[in-house]
Amino acid sequence: MTDYSKTVNLLESPFPMRGNLAKREPAWLKSWYEQKRYQKLREIAKGRPKFILHDGPPYANGDIHIGHAVNKILKDIIIRSKTQAGFDAPYVPGWDCHGLPIEVMVEKLHGKDMPKARFRELCREYAAEQIARQKKDFIRLGVLGDWDHPYLTMDFKTEADTVRMLGEIYKSGYLYRGAKPVQFCLDCGSSLAEAEVEYKDKISPAIDVAYLFKDTAALAAAFGLAGFEGKAFAVIWTTTPWTLPASQAVSAGADVVYQLIDTPKGKLVLAKDLAEDALKRYGFSDGIAILAETTGDKLENLHMNHPFLERDIPMLNGEHVTTDAGTGLVHTAPAHGLEDYAVCNKYGIELYNPVNAEGRYIGETPRVAGMRVWEANPVILQWLEETGNLLASSKIEHSYAHCWRHKTPLIYRATGQWFVGMDKAGADGKTLRDKAIKAVDDTEFFPSWGRARLEAMIEGRPDWVVSRQRYWGTPMTFFVHKETGELHPNSAELLEKVALKIEEKGIEAWFSLDKSELLSAEDCENYDKLSDTMDVWFDSGSTHYSVVKQREELEWPADLYLEGSDQHRGWFQSSMLTGCASSMGRAPYKQLLTHGFVVDGEGKKMSKSIGNVVAPQEVYNEFGADILRLWAASTDYSGELAISKEILKRVTESYRRIRNTLSFLFANLSDFNPIEDAVQQADMVEIDRYAVVLARQLQECLAGDYYPRYAFHFAVKDIVSFCSEDLGAFYLDILKDRLYTTKADSHARRSAQTALYHITRSLVLLIAPILCFTGEEAWDIIGGGEEDSVLFHTWHEFPTINEKTEAELVKKWTAIREAREAVTAAIEPLRADKTVGSSLQAEAEITAPEEMAGYLNALGEELRFALLVSKAEVKVGSELAVAAKASDGEKCERCWHYTRDVGAVAGYETVCKRCAENVGGEGETRHYA
């Protein structure tokens, strides 16, 4: 008896169904590094149009977390997809190396008692160690880049160019020195940039305080009264009692309506809109009378006594005054608030700051001298009670600024700092704020809501405090006049001389510099070296100049910056400001892409204390980096990205669908040589031509739309859908009969293999930006061997087909697919009650509208192959309907179809006539399916 299993084309796949990614990925990485894949790619891509994604530098401290992984994976997908789209897309990874967190770690490890030069040396060593750890993890994720030559903000050349960027801004006229209130962290002992501030809820005392008017006659006149008897008070409301020792004025809104109200306390001035609530707080319900009303502009320049100090307090008009809460009058301490500073500055009131850098009151402040500000609140409340000026006291929970490092509340504190002015006219007569808002207009945003967010932040941001009183940072390399505080008139030239020294020896060249090396003897007498360092956001915000503009393989401006949504107030903004404030005069990027934060499966923020942290190292060690990459790509990054073991298991199912599809494709291509065996497009079996069109449409969608607009979750969805629906549930299901049962080198089979070759090659190229390991594994089989890379090739070139012919082909086969779905649905009850096993055991009678019936009948005897039944008949009717029944034919041992001609050919007693022809004759011919 013949064993017909040996006559079918069941081939082994060179692409295993099990990826075993966690184990195999490290070996692939080693091989690619040894082959110098990145360097070869740069050679291959020479002369192509450039695409520059500039890497926002992660901070060189601690292991990478899942947010870092998302960020680097998204960047890598873009770099790879742009490369395959025909661009030269070099990727230079970078690290942010200066700043307080590293200082804190070095102090913990080595203590504080050492020369500053040694301290900076240890900071540099610590940063280098952290970079080595993080680099290893980024490479493990499959991120392709120039890892042997990353940029570091602590590289001597980068430090020098950061100094040069400072010089650019100085020459543009935006840099100035001023004593202004800035966000100040008492634990850092330093001012903070906006990006270093986070807001959390805090419980604070909320108090109403009375300021006694000195001249009641003047107050009466302001309210249009001839006079009145008794005392009168302006009442303020504040949540920062500790600022009252610095109170220098009270501000009223010029257009706000105020009432003079007679109360048991005396006459009180309160905003009309807030008076009722305020009086309730004071417990005044009886003996109240509204005497008169006036507007805030009439109260201007009246004078009061400070509630517990001997100090004159003028009434000012301030635009910052609102009637949202409180009393409508605002106690004004220019040392502790930007708006307070602005209004006092307008009135020429000299700033008084009673709080030192440790957050303690200086010696001349009674009762609270030497205390830290937070300790002073209860003392000040007691003081107010003693003077009779505390009208109400309660607790309030409100959003308050905290240090992002220490998680402790910040204070506003006036200090002498260097600023980049937002509203100061530069050398070209334009303000930096106007330039930056114009730059926002010129930038493309992904997602689009990023534009409004960044614009609002630029419109509302204060001047940028760029100086820091720290040790491990790029120095502000200026010489300052000892008496006037003015910069040396030759600052631009001196700065360049210092930059050249820093290029050779790093920032230590400035800290160890003897003034006499650059200044005359007279200037040495009159000028001091500035000891301040620069805000680390200035370092990273200058990398478009220190890296993108300097490195030969890059081009300025960058095409894309891609970071988390917090970078609208961080790197996106600092980069824009340095770009606009320098001679470049524009944003250093054309596009901004923002991704959300990673949360757990329930949408909760990750926290070690909760125990819901998912570490990227755990994911790639268990599942493989390709699964992590597929998760990142399949999630809509414009919002929060949820991750958990359950979510990763679902992602693994999608991966398995893609992998199993590739395994099947490669098995059926293992005896196919595209040069010798390919069938011309016009000669292919019709369904093969249709399948190639579907593959080409998928490629056009991904390569022409989803990848260029960074819509990776749509790309993944369509790839999985193509594998499971277009291929798995339709084309490959139909194709198995022809692949397995026709002659190995027949036209029917070679046509199918030609289609599979185009589909496979395109599919591998399409998945490769996302599944970089799997893509390369597959390319080893279908590409040019182990030394070849999928990245060395652009998108697949499909055979051309006439547009009209294609449209007709798609229309026809869309109708056939609809009929096939109806047939499958009609057979399902027969399978459920075990009347039939597979659909091949069934016959179908189809009633279809005329056009569909025409398409079905055009397939003739091959219709049964397209419908996966043993027999099919079609008749015309008004709507689609299918009647299915079990076939009365006999099962062919070879093809498993049920026919009435099994054993019809002598010597082939257990197989059908078609199989007998395919085994012993010339083989069958197919035209349609």
Curated annotation (Swiss-Prot):
Q: Where in the cell is it found?
A: Cytoplasm
Biological process, per Gene Ontology = isoleucyl-tRNA aminoacylation
- What does the record give as cofactor? Zn(2+)
The entry marks the following residues as binding L-isoleucyl-5'-AMP, namely 563
What general EC class does the enzyme of this chain belong to?
ligase
| Annotated binding of Zn(2+), by residue | 892, 895, 912, 915
Q: What is known of its domains?
A: IleRS has two distinct active sites: one for aminoacylation and one for editing. The misactivated valine is translocated from the active site to the editing site, which sterically excludes the correctly activated isoleucine. The single editing site contains two valyl binding pockets, one specific for each substrate (Val-AMP or Val-tRNA(Ile)).
Say what the protein does.
Catalyzes the attachment of isoleucine to tRNA(Ile). As IleRS can inadvertently accommodate and process structurally similar amino acids such as valine, to avoid such errors it has two additional distinct tRNA(Ile)-dependent editing activities. One activity is designated as 'pretransfer' editing and involves the hydrolysis of activated Val-AMP. The other activity is designated 'posttransfer' editing and involves deacylation of mischarged Val-tRNA(Ile).
Task: State what protein this is by name.
Answer: Isoleucine--tRNA ligase
| Gene that specifies this protein | ileS
